[in-house]
């Protein structure tokens, strides 16, 4: 059956979403993005170049195109209420309403929801609304804290005591952002990502993924939106036991049930970022959409019709039989401008070489007269797929190394050495 789908967003995540939808030749794609993503544009029937939060322009475009459904990529339009407005116009969405999106956009709401419903995995926390309250708690707390702005930060706004700042630095950072912060116990362990399709009641998990936030090899340098990620052929990670996986899945299932019980049912993609600690998985945060880069890992493995999954989520009858992933490993490597993230060099030309069997996803890149140029954020990503992690990494690394220009990437993502480092760290904690 023909289906017209609106895709909102223009990054690498949205290119992955668009490609997955386009695997069904009966699906017609219409796109809204602030800047033209050449990969998305080539797969779209029509493109509206407009800021994704400019809902007054998005709604008429969607209705004029006659779309049957929308898929929302980034978090900002969710916070702006794009799903509510689309549904008022008769267009259902893969994405939560503004109220349900608070699971990501309001960290205080998220923690209080978990506390009210007795959901496991919630770290010790304190919500502060002014700098003086934050100062008193930071200075009196026995241990290190994570200082988190209550609202959206693009994944780059958290300061961790003992890693980024000391006590005085934490107090100053809380003051700089106005004192509206969530202060949480610093979690020690290994991070992992569990994403799931959610129809308001039913939750179908995707393969586990591990992202790499630090800019440089060896996990050093400033935090970024994510330099790359990997997943294994068994859809697990070697430092996450089956028991800990089941605990994380239960936390997400309980969170969806809590949202439904409070009258704000959650429909869309639920992204759980967990720290696997000595006590088991703890929730670092929830996101109300696919991760970037993690979307590229899981959607590169999706064997089911993505448009069909969207339809089942909208209808509220999602079942495990609707979702199937290939039993393969994936490695995603982002190329970023020289100087990223602090002083990225924009407007530098790029040349793609022979990238073999890798999948290419365009992100913050501009095509002018047939030549690609860097912008100020992550440029493009390659995903390698293979029977083993080593095979997938070799495909991704060969592709990433084929690009010439003022860009760099982390060569260590997906290598046996970095995986063993993660496992050794987990063994030391336990």
Curated annotation (Swiss-Prot):
Positions with a binding annotation for ATP: 138-193
Alphabetic keyword roster: ATP-binding, Ligase, Magnesium, Manganese, Metal-binding, Nucleotide-binding, Purine biosynthesis
All copies of domain ATP-grasp, residue ranges: 111-315
SUPFAM superfamilies found in the cross-reference section: Glutathione synthetase ATP-binding domain-like, PreATP-grasp domain, Rudiment single hybrid motif
Pathway in which this enzyme or protein is active: Purine metabolism; IMP biosynthesis via de novo pathway; N(1)-(5-phospho-D-ribosyl)glycinamide from 5-phospho-alpha-D-ribose 1-diphosphate: step 2/2
Annotated residues for binding of Mg(2+) 2: 285, 287
Comment on bound cofactor: Binds 2 magnesium or manganese ions per subunit.
Gene3D superfamilies reported in the protein's UniProt record: 3.40.50.20, ATP-grasp fold, A domain (3.30.1490.20), ATP-grasp fold, B domain (3.30.470.20), Phosphoribosylglycinamide synthetase, C-terminal domain (3.90.600.10)
Binding site for Mg(2+) 1: 273, 285
E.C. code: 6.3.4.13
PANTHER family: PHOSPHORIBOSYLAMINE--GLYCINE LIGASE (PTHR43472), PHOSPHORIBOSYLAMINE--GLYCINE LIGASE, CHLOROPLASTIC (PTHR43472:SF1)
Protein name: Phosphoribosylamine--glycine ligase
Annotated gene: purD
């Amino acid at each position: 059956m023909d289906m017209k789908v609106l895709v909102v967003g223009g990054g690498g995540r949205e290119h992955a979403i668009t490609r997955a939808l386009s695997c069904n030749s009966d699906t017609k794609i219409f796109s809204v993005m602030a800047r033209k993503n050449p990969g998305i544009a080539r797969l779209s029937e029509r493109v509206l170049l407009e800021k994704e939060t400019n809902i007054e322009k998005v709604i008429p475009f969607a209705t004029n195109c006659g779309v049957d459904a929308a898929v929302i990529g980034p978090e900002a339009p969710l916070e702006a209420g794009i799903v509510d407005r689309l549904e008022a116009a008769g267009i259902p969405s893969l994405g939560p309403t503004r109220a349900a999106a608070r699971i990501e956009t309001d960290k205080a709401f998220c923690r209080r929801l978990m506390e009210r419903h007795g959901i496991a995995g919630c770290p010790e926390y304190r919500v502060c609304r002014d700098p003086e309250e934050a100062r008193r708690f930071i200075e009196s707390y026995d241990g290190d804290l994570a200082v988190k702005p209550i609202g959206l930060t693009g994944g780059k706004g958290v300061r961790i005591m003992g890693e980024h700042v000391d006590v005085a630095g934490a107090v100053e950072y809380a003051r700089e952002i106005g004192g509206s912060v969530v202060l949480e116990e610093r979690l020690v362990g290994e991070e992992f990502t569990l994403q799931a399709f959610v129809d308001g009641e039913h939750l179908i998990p995707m393969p586990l993924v591990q992202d790499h936030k630090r800019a440089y090899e060896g996990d050093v340098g400033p935090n970024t939106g994510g330099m790359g990620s990997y997943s294994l052929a068994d859809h697990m990670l070697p430092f996450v036991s089956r028991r800990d996986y089941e605990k994380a899945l239960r936390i997400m299932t309980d969170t969806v049930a809590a949202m439904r019980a409070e009258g704000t049912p959650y429909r869309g993609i639920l992204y759980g970022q967990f720290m696997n600690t000595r006590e088991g998985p703890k929730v670092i945060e929830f996101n109300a959409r696919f991760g970037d880069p993690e979307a590229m890992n899981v959607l590169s493995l999706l064997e089911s019709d993505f448009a069909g999954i969207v339809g089942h989520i909208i209808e509220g009858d999602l079942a495990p039989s609707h979702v199937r992933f290939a039993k393969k490993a994936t490695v995603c490597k982002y190329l970023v401008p020289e100087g990223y993230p602090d002083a990225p060099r924009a407007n530098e030309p790029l040349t793609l070489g022979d990238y073999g069997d890798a999948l290419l996803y365009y992100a913050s890149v501009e095509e002018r007269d047939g030549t690609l140029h860097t912008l100020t954020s992550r440029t493009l990503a390659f995903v390698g797929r293979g029977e083993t992690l080593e095979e997938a990494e070799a495909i991704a690394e060969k592709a990433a190394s084929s690009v010439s220009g003022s860009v760099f990437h982390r060569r260590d993502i997906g290598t046996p050495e970095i995986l063993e480092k993660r496992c050794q760290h987990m063994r030391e904690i336990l």
